[in-house]
Every structure is written in structure tokens, then in C-alpha cells.
């Protein structure tokens, strides 16, 4: 009985530690965890997208406000100040993600359909995640990290972690492990 109690307490402590421990951006820059830094787009007020959503028409989408634009610039400055370099910068095709990635300004931004939001069924969840998993699987295990600017649902589906706007999770596709990275805007 005593051992089962200790095991239960140990498991609970491990769960709490796993969900609360985050590495600082400086720690991540000095020793990146995995090859991928997943970033949720910066603040875009509202919930979901309007019913008239069209992929290439930002006027039909929820977009960054000025606070979100400033948040994006601050994230980019924090990346540069930490000396963080990215091998590639990839973004969802949604306007709020593309604008976040461009305002961060740490490299040429490439659209990646595997980063698109399947929250409202605009794209199919399984096909989108299959595309992203293929991209992650094809990443060489060594090299500078890649930055993926995407949505809450995508980050959660891959890492099991929820994130707020402008928050980051480091992900290792080889071990399928993830760790939060604290940004100055958190």
C-alpha cells in the first residue's frame, strides 16, 4: 500500500513538472531542444474565422491587431537578442500567421499547408496533420532549428500542449517530446 501511494505521488509530481516547467528563450538559444520551435500566431482578437473565410483574402479572416503586430516584432527582437538562428521559417497560409512570421523577421517565410488550422473544418484535420508529420519526419536530425508559425489546434495536436497567442513550444520530432519555451511576451 505504501509503495503504491509513493508511486502515485511520483507520477503526479512528474505530470505537474512536465506541464509547468519551461525553458527560457536564452536556454533554448544556447541548447535547442529538438529541431522545431512551434509558435502560435500573435494576438488576433476574436475566436475562429468568419463564415465567409477565403484563404487568400485577409479581409475575410481574423487578423492581428496592433497589439499582435507589436508582439510579433518583440518576439523577433527577442530571437535576435538571444542569438537564435533558424534554418527555415514556415507558416500556415492564414493571414495572421503569415503576418506574425513576416513581422518576426528572422528569415524568408515559406507557406506550409501542414500548419493550416483545421479548427472550423476549413481544411481537413487528418490530411493537414499528415502533411505536417511528413514535413517533421523529413527534417534532418541535426542543424539549426526551424520556426513553425501556426495555430493552437495544430500545436496541441502535435505536442499535446495548449498555448496562448505568441507562445512557443520546442518540439523534437525524433523523440516526439515537447517543452515550453518562455518568451519575453509571455
Q: What do these predicted ranges mean?
A:
Residues 123-131:
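Short, surface-exposed amphipathic charged segments that create phosphate/polyanion-binding patches used
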Residues 1-7:
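Bacterial N-terminal signal peptides that target proteins for export
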Residues 130-140:
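A short, acidic, amphipathic alpha-helical segment used as a generic capping/interface helix at domain edges
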Residues 23-113, 118-121, 161-186:
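Active-site-proximal alpha-helix that buttresses catalytic centers in soluble enzyme cores
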Residues 17-19:
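N-terminal signal peptide c-region/cleavage motif recognized by signal peptidases
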Residues 7-15:
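Bacterial N-terminal signal peptides
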Residues 34-36, 144-150:
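Generic beta-sheet signal
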Amino acid at each position: 500500500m505504501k509503495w503504491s501511494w509513493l508511486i502515485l505521488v511520483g507520477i503526479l509530481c512528474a505530470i505537474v513538472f512536465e506541464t509547468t516547467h519551461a525553458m527560457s528563450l536564452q536556454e533554448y538559444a544556447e541548447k535547442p531542444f529538438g529541431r522545431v520551435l512551434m509558435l502560435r500566431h500573435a494576438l488576433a482578437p476574436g475566436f475562429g474565422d468568419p463564415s465567409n473565410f477565403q484563404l487568400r483574402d485577409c479581409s475575410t479572416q481574423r487578423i492581428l491587431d496592433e497589439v499582435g503586430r507589436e508582439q510579433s516584432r518583440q518576439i523577433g527582437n527577442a530571437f535576435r537578442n538571444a542569438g537564435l538562428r533558424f534554418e527555415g521559417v514556415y507558416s500556415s497560409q492564414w493571414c495572421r500567421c503569415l503576418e506574425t512570421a513576416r513581422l518576426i523577421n528572422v528569415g524568408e517565410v515559406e507557406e506550409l499547408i501542414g500548419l493550416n488550422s483545421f479548427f472550423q473544418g476549413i481544411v481537413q484535420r487528418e490530411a493537414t496533420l499528415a502533411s505536417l508529420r511528413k514535413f517533421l519526419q523529413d527534417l534532418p536530425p541535426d542543424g539549426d532549428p526551424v520556426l513553425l508559425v501556426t495555430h493552437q489546434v495544430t500545436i496541441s495536436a502535435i505536442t499535446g500542449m495548449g498555448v496562448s497567442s505568441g507562445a512557443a513550444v520546442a518540439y523534437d520530432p525524433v523523440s516526439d517530446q515537447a517543452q515550453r519555451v518562455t518568451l519575453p511576451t509571455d
